[in-house]
Amino acid sequence: EILRCLVGSEMCIRDSTRDLALSVYFMLPSCVPATGLDESGAVLEAEQLRPYYQLPRVLGLAELMNSYGTVRADEKILQKICDCTAAGKRIDGHAPFLSGEELNAYIAAGVQSDHECSDIHEAMEKLRRGQYIMVREGTAAQNMDSLLPLFQEPYCSRCMLVTDDKHPGDLLQGGHIDYIIRKAIAAGVDPVVAVRMGTLVPCQYFGLAHSGAVAPGYTADLIVLSDLEQFTVEQVYKKGKLVAQQGRMLHPAALTVDKARFARVFDSFNMDEVTPEQLQLKQTGTRQQSGRNETKGANLPCFKALGRCSAFWAAAA
């Protein structure tokens, strides 16, 4: 399963995201599984991650969720940190509510940012200790309103905009970083500051020295807006070439994927078929509802739906 996992990673990095009208970068997963209690499809240790640091579109180690393992000097976690540091790349944090001496130890280990701040006091403590703050506004968590004081000097030069988890439907309907910029401007933030936090600051943080600004020596990745209030993107330029206009790509890229690698990744669900009948629950008694007794042994529709969801996730695991 480790081999399949690595083949899947290679497919994402080498095949499906190259030569697009979009620059796609990666952070390596630091916690697979997320905790020792998880039953993941694979366990990725430092030795499996190490070769990927040499790839130019791999920028570092993703959110170090096992913050307490880091503070307690777990050898496996520290080895991942050492490998990333030796490669000269970034280590992202994930440490909600970590404070005081434990936060000091976490940052001293080499963790350089955090996206889990839900209030301004937590963000300020982490800023004062040298971390970058990723202001998160996604589907599952929305922290921007609580962190609005960061959208001004002297803090905004160390803060950037991120979504963390955002559902595809929300991306299509509302947008990505552009959505956060619009929301920030509507809340009274200086448009120049909001744009800088969505472009220049993250590029500086991740070491993308020639991206994030309109200036000599920078890659001509540009957008043309109708205005700064609605922040409607009219045109998108990639390396100086017009690639999208009024929300549509002009020349969609043909996806080329190594067929052998594709088969190894997608032909990987080794389990018996799960049927809805296996997951249906039967009532064993009666209960009063709307003035009448329900029938014993009736199938509950909510459990039928749950069964379908469970079957999907069981297959995905």
Residue ranges and their predicted role:
Residues 1-8, 12:
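Single conserved hydrophobic/aromatic residue that forms the stacking wall/gate
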Residues 10, 14-16, 310, 317:
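N-terminal hydrophobic targeting/anchoring segments and the immediately downstream early-domain regions
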Residues 15-26, 81-88:
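Alpha-helix-loop-beta-strand connector modules within alpha/beta enzyme cores
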Residues 20-38:
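Metal-cofactor-binding active-site regions of metalloenzymes
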Residues 32-37, 68-71, 99-103, 123-124, ...:
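Flexible loop/turn segments at secondary-structure boundaries
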Residues 43-63, 69-134, 141-162, 172-187, ...:
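Histidine/acidic residue-rich metal-binding segments in metalloenzymes
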Residues 172-188, 192-317:
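Active-site microenvironment of metallo-dependent hydrolases
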